[in-house]
Amino acid sequence: MANLLFALAAYLIGSVSFAVVVSKVMGLPDPHTYGSGNPGATNVLRTGNKKAAIFTLIGDGLKGWLAVWLASRFGPAYGLDDNGLAMVALAVFLGHLFPVFHRFAGGKGVATAAGVLLAINPILGLATLATWVIIAFFFRYSSLAALVAAIFAPVFYVLMEGIDAMAGAVLIIAILLIARHRQNIAKLLTGKESRIGEKKKV
């Protein structure tokens, strides 16, 4: 029961879309209505408002980290086990992808996944973030960087921690993140994908 309750709480935390919240507070258009239509930091950046994009990035990452950290810190006292912690990691990510508070129209989960990985193991999170930064720096495609980082994240985890329930959760997160980027993959292949910092009319 503890596993399910903590997973449900994590899903609700993940369901808070900071792209939508920040945009409303800062008087920007709904991120679903412009650019890629994705409620995430990269799309918010297309408005030209860097502060809004930064707040979105921090918020989405923080909720992923917070859900897993709180569960790992306080969960065991209430019966949360390793399987439950893996469920929490996956649930907060699913909340971002399919948020109950925003008609299940969520983002692609890059920042939230990063927060989850940092909470699981800071070195794991930093290694995955470093992978993203390297690809983004050289190729200037946020989506490509996310895809490569997603591929390496489960590999990094297994090398550091071995195969367990959390490894399964990280693998599922990676697969879902890649699946959410299917349109970006098509655009990358056709040369139509937007580069980092490129503005679009909103």
Curated annotation (Swiss-Prot):
Q: Which GO terms describe its molecular function?
A: acyl-phosphate glycerol-3-phosphate acyltransferase activity
Give the reactions, separated by semicolons, that this protein catalyses: an acyl phosphate + sn-glycerol 3-phosphate = a 1-acyl-sn-glycero-3-phosphate + phosphate
Q: What is its EC number?
A: 2.3.1.275
Membrane topology note: Multi-pass membrane protein
Its pathway is: Lipid metabolism; phospholipid metabolism
The entry's protein name is Glycerol-3-phosphate acyltransferase
Q: Which family is this sequence assigned to?
A: Belongs to the PlsY family.
Q: Which UniProt keywords apply?
A: Cell inner membrane, Cell membrane, Lipid biosynthesis, Lipid metabolism, Membrane, Phospholipid biosynthesis, Phospholipid metabolism, Transferase, Transmembrane, Transmembrane helix
Task: Note the subunit structure.
Answer: Probably interacts with PlsX.
Among the GO biological process terms of this entry, one is: phospholipid biosynthetic process
- Which gene codes for it? plsY
Q: Which Pfam family, just one, is annotated for this protein?
A: G3P_acyltransf
Q: Which NCBIfam families match?
A: glycerol-3-phosphate 1-O-acyltransferase PlsY
Q: Which SMART domains match?
A: G3P_acyltransf (SM01207)
Cellular component, GO, one term: plasma membrane
User: Where is the chain membrane-spanning?
Assistant: 2-22, 85-105, 119-139, 158-178
Record's signal peptide = none
Q: Which organism is it from?
A: Cupriavidus pinatubonensis (strain JMP 134 / LMG 1197)
Its function, per the record, reads: Catalyzes the transfer of an acyl group from acyl-phosphate (acyl-PO(4)) to glycerol-3-phosphate (G3P) to form lysophosphatidic acid (LPA). This enzyme utilizes acyl-phosphate as fatty acyl donor, but not acyl-CoA or acyl-ACP.
Cell compartments where the protein resides: Cell inner membrane
